[in-house]
């Protein structure tokens, strides 16, 4: 899959989340597609930063992301974070994703 296709999929994922009431502050592509080291079968690693996750526990966040992934039916591996969690950067995924590519938001 080329980078344009990946960006289109991430865009569809973000739109699907927003249609479900999640205001996405940022979407950060990280992992193999961000670094250019993808191979056939690579999934699309993305961090979704949203204020909507502030009062949600881990399992509720997974449910929200999983429902959107099922709707677009693409190989997305997503992690939900609040803006504060992203800014602190103390979660291991945030440390990896800091070197990623901002593909939505600012």
Predicted regions located by residue number:
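Short beta-strand->loop micro-motif that forms the acidic, two-metal-ion catalytic signature
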Residues: 45-48
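Catalytic core of pol beta-like nucleotidyltransferases
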Residues: 1-25, 35-40, 51-106
């Amino acid at each position: 899959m080329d980078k344009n296709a990946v960006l289109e999929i991430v865009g569809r994922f973000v739109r699907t989340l927003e249609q479900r009431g999640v205001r996405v502050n940022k979407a950060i592509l990280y992992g193999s597609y961000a670094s250019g080291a993808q191979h056939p079968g690579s999934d699309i690693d993305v961090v979704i930063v949203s204020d909507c996750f502030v009062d949600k526990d881990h399992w509720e966040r997974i449910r929200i992301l999983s429902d959107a992934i099922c709707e677009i039916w693409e190989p997305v591996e997503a992690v939900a974070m609040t803006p504060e969690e992203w800014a602190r950067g103390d979660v291991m995924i945030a440390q990896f994703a800091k070197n990623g590519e901002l593909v939505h938001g600012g």
